[in-house]
Amino acid sequence: MAKERIRIVVCGDKGVGKSSLIACLVKDQFIPNLQDALPAVTIPRDFSASPYSPQNTILVDTKNSDLAGLQKELKNADVIWLVYADHDSYERIALYWMMMFRSLGLNLPVILCRNKSDDGIEYCRSNLTAGGEGDCGTIVEDEEFIPILKAFKEVETCIKCSAKNKLNVNQAFYLCQRAITHPLAPLFDARIGELKPLAIQALKRIFVLSDKDQDDYLSSEEIAALQKKCFGKTMDVNELNFIYKTLVDLSASNQQYADCSLFVQNKGITKMGFLVLNKMYAENGRHETTWGILRSFHYTDSLSISDKVLYPKVDITDTSSVELSPLGYRFLVDVFLAFDKDNDGGLNEDELNVLFKCTPGLPKLWSETCFPYSTVVNNRGFITLQGWLAHWSMTTFIDYKTTTEYLVYLGFEKDAKLALHVTRARRKRRRNGIFYRAPVNDRKVFNCYILGKPNSGKSSLLESFLGRPFSETYSPTIRPKIAVNSLELKGGKQYYLILQEFGQQEPAILENQQKVMECDVLCLAYDSSDPESFSYLVNLVNRYQHLKALPMVFVALKADLDKQQQRCNVQPDDFTEQLLLEHPLHISCMWPSSLNELFIKLTDVALEPAKNTPELVPEPIQEDTTVYWQATVVAGSLLGLASIFTFTLSRLINSWRNVPN
């Protein structure tokens, strides 16, 4: 990535012209009879015409007589400008200088420069063209450079210069900068002439994201869009045709690509063609182009996406929750539709595999929750759009960092935190000495824990929530289960409800008060046909007193079976009355209407927690005094009018009596 400052250390045998190169670069002229070593020179960004220059570049001259000082400077360097000038100094490149760098444990790019090449302009990266600033390179078969390049992977580029004739001095300096701003080593293995695996992986991902219609080709329009995104400018038709022709010619002339298509007429560039094109850029010294593509997709020098992009800082209080914003939902809808190639309304396994090729794979959280069976699937087991959005809503609620990470991998181009909505902190109120949660009006995702004795019907409840048929087969829950779905309340408002069952981990979960407080509503379920079932809930509530801080809904499951008297010191209706709660809802997986009533009830309670908070005395109903006061005002007005009428009438009568006959 672009650095604010680059430190270039110039080293080599005495007399090879290190100081002359620096002086020529700075003064733009050859200066003879310089001192043994120049002081460090700071070169600002505007010195170079290159758009990739850092804010400052420091050039450090060295002298061999001060070995300790030389080694200190090398350890502080970003890049090494290694200079030789004749056969003897060339021999010491491999025998002395490269060995010294390795003994110091340096892992820095080395730009090898043959100075005093006063007879011509030559510049080599292996035996291939490496166009530098101004694209001045020529193809060079150089018996000096090639052995060094093959023997030492640290040597990134070789160039012939002349300080006396001012030849390639600026280019050599530019190559030193480019070795840091646009390093070749992460992209290309010069020894085997191939792109490195991480580069291939990154470029394949970029191809998939740029292939908007998912037809496995980059069309002219898609290439133009990629060009605009990466470089901020459009691509000329002639440039595009030149790329196409290059790929076609390469397919015809190179046996390596005989069995694969690089470009198909009227369709576009294939994935292999895209990789080959970037390989050619690396071979020809134009890897700035590849880096321009990579960095527009947020890749760092290590070919990983920056953590600052994957995990943006989001300010969240302890009692806030995180949900998807409308922008996040819109993006995920677009992703679903783009990868649903057969337009059947569901993502099958192959479509999901293609979708997640752009990412590190299926999110760990999804694997742990048995995706896709933790949400809505169609009759063929393919996740639907409803299930897709529900699962992402759950993921964001539980671990929003997974959501931002995968949104970036899937091609979300804006700041990932714009895809999130942070709810207001949960507020508490107090009534008669009991704290309870205030009503919620800015949330759409709620978390419900289902607690109850094994074999009470909790798993069947989760399956019914996802619209699946009831199964008579009992399978004990060992690991936690989770289900998420959307539901619509009166008024057309849509919410997402997460149901969690903990199985054998239930005691450990309930011991963890912080984990318990993440819940919005408790669903306490028992088997109404099992006389031993309800006592489990009584013991649970009495043992874990902190559960009473949460709103509760008691549920009598298997209501289609014969109801049994519970073998407990308190019956369900009496126990709920003691807690000042409503009597248990009678639910059966065989009665769809009762299930819908339960899920709506759970969501309503999450929105209005006070209604179902244990031991919370209902707020006194205040009589509506409006009618009373209206009646009082009317009566007062009538009384006033009557008084005025009586007074006026009496005055009239008196005046009549006083009139003489």
UniProtKB/Swiss-Prot annotation:
Residue ranges constituting the Miro domain according to the UniProt record: 3-182, 443-608
Cell location: Mitochondrion outer membrane
Per UniProt, residues of the EF-hand domain are 198-233, 327-362
Binding sites annotated in the UniProt record for Ca(2+) 1:
D211, D213, D215, Y217, E222
Residue ranges annotated as transmembrane are 627-647
Q: Which residues lie on this side of the membrane: Cytoplasmic?
A: 1-626
What UniProt keywords apply to this chain's record, in alphabetical order?
Calcium, GTP-binding, Hydrolase, Membrane, Metal-binding, Mitochondrion, Mitochondrion outer membrane, Nucleotide-binding, Repeat, Transmembrane, Transmembrane helix
Query: What are the GO cellular component annotations?
Result: ERMES complex; mitochondrial outer membrane
Q: How does it sit in the membrane?
A: Single-pass type IV membrane protein
What's a GO biological-process term for it?
A: phospholipid homeostasis
Q: Does the keyword Translocase apply?
A: no
Binding residues for GTP 1? 12-19, 61-63, 115-118
Which function does this protein serve? Mitochondrial GTPase involved in mitochondrial trafficking. Probably involved in control of anterograde transport of mitochondria and their subcellular distribution.
- What protein family is recorded? Belongs to the mitochondrial Rho GTPase family.
Record-linked PANTHER family: EF-HAND CALCIUM-BINDING DOMAIN-CONTAINING PROTEIN 7 (PTHR46819:SF1)
**Protein name (Swiss-Prot/TrEMBL):** Mitochondrial Rho GTPase 1
- This protein's species is Eremothecium gossypii (strain ATCC 10895 / CBS 109.51 / FGSC 9923 / NRRL Y-1056) (Yeast)
What gene is behind this protein?
GEM1
